[in-house]
Amino acid sequence: MELDLISYELDEKTKEGIEKVVEKFFTKAEPDLVLIFDKAGRILACKGMDISDTYSEFISSILSALFFASEELTSMLDKNDEMKDVFYETKNRVFLMARLEKDFLIGVISRKNLSLGSIRLFFNHLVSDLNAVLKNLKEVEKKSLKISKEELKKKLDQILGS
């Protein structure tokens, strides 16, 4: 079994760039939550609802799964089609997800306090601006850790006290 380890380095300049772009989006769209995360659900940035790290990671993992399931469905229907973003709405909220540079994803959850057209327009600008910031993100050599399932189970049992 190989464990995927983080393959990017988030420097201060990039962090500040992300924060600035997200703050600009917040003043326009007033969303409930903005999450920027990698494809494994690890969070780069989180702004909005006052939620625990565990809960935000849980949300980002679900959003990641939704995005990639939608991407797979798109590919099954037409190999030449390309996933742009995922948009869906509930009675009270709007959910938007898109792929960013360097295999990052963004998820936005918003109450329906703006027109859907405005939310989508602001979201498209957000994605474009974040891509400009993330384009310069330093990638580091990806390391993989090989470990047997038995050894992993043993380590987890030690950590969890089982």
Swiss-Prot record:
Keyword set includes Transport: no
Residue ranges of the TM segments: none
SUPFAM superfamilies in the cross-refs: Roadblock/LC7 domain (SSF103196)
Classification via Gene3D superfamilies: Dynein light chain 2a, cytoplasmic
Keyword tags: Coiled coil
Protein name: Uncharacterized protein aq_1822
Alphabetized PANTHER family for the sequence: LATE ENDOSOMAL/LYSOSOMAL MP1 INTERACTING PROTEIN (PTHR13323)
InterPro entries: LAMTOR2-like, Roadblock/LAMTOR2_dom
GO molecular function per UniProt: guanyl-nucleotide exchange factor activity; molecular adaptor activity
Entry-linked Pfam families: Robl_LC7 (PF03259)
GO BP term, pick one: cellular response to amino acid stimulus
Coiled-coil regions listed: 129-161
Highest rank taxon of the organism: Bacteria
UniProt keyword Protein transport, yes or no: no
